[in-house]
Amino acid sequence: MIKNLNLLLRNFVCLLFLLFVNLFFSQIDNEKFTVVLDAGHGGKDPGNRGNGYYEKNIALSIALKIGKELEKRNDIKIIYTRKTDVFVDLFKRAQIANKAKADLFISIHCDAHNSNAYGAGTFVLGLHANQRNFEIAKKENSVIFKEKNYEQNYGGFNPNNPESVISLVLMQEEYLDQSIVAANLIQEFFTKNLKRKNRTVKQAGFIVLKYTYMPSVLVETGFLTNKNEGKYLN
């Protein structure tokens, strides 16, 4: 399993570098390309706990290891929304990225469904195409109920109401095309390089992607509810 994870990390770093070169070729000379790695959940929010694994721990481990590899490059600057097991409000994660004027925001998560579901999927902000996408976003967005003053911070947004999602989409529309390109490259990497089941690029209403003023994606690296995939990710 360690060998598989190391392979994942090495290939993911290569993928991101190619993404930087091909997608963001207009980057100013000598200016570092800034990537924000957002380890989902943390602290009092464990995320999903399929098969006894903690999503918050696995997401953090992946983010730190990818960041460590990317930090070896002089032309890339890495910023983390968290580097320890702490709780960070969703809107503050976006604030970190915006303050850094980041070029790319990647939120790292693990999925949960039934024990047979497996594979990796990548999301960009958008309207839910189906009930399953809505349920995934609702699960990730429900963390706001753990935050203080969440009603004021998110303008009355209700994760349980599909109509609330419409207002989310407008702010990220400017970056949607680049987000989709990035998501497609990440998804292609998962399926072609790591031979993971292709759960495709999807759109859903994730709050964490709403307030970022840059291309942004959310990666569901696999299903902790699947025993084999849980071991793979852990």
Please report, for each region that a protein language model flagged, where it lies by residue.
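Flexible hinge/switch segments at interdomain interfaces of large molecular machines
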Residues: Y154-P162, L218
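Short alpha-helical linear motifs
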Residues: V143, N160-N161, K227-N228
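Bacterial N-terminal signal peptides that target proteins for export
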Residues: I2-V13
